[in-house]
């Protein structure tokens, strides 16, 4: 059964990324299948995961370009999978609101329910 953990706070610099990356790595070290979704336009969790690709697929491509989520998940250097973040997520927020698709993320995660122990 997939467990979803959300780490959120409006204030910057409080350790959200550090907590998320370390939690994902710790769970992966115990042989659990983990997907970290980086929703930060700065993409710091993506960088911390060791993703070197210049413009990796993000939720933006899944929403606007109908890219498969499986083509948007990358393996981290610490043993967990990551759906990268990046600057295009700023436009995604507007698109979701304008198209009245507030359930987009929930539906996207639902499709992965059986593939990961933790998201």
Report residues per predicted region.
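P-loop NTP-binding core
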Residues: 1-119
């Amino acid at each position: 059964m997939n467990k979803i953990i959300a780490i959120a706070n409006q204030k910057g610099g409080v350790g959200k990324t550090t907590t998320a990356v370390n939690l994902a790595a710790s769970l992966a070290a115990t042989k659990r299948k983990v997907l970290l979704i980086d929703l930060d336009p700065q993409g710091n969790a993506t960088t911390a995961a060791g993703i070197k690709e210049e413009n990796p697929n993000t939720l933006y491509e899944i929403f606007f370009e109908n890219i498969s989520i499986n083509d948007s998940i990358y393996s981290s250097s610490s043993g967990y999978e990551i759906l990268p973040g990046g600057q295009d997520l700023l436009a995604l927020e507007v698109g979701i609101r304008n198209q009245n698709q507030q359930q987009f993320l929930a539906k996207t995660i639902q499709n992965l329910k059986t593939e990961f122990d933790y998201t």
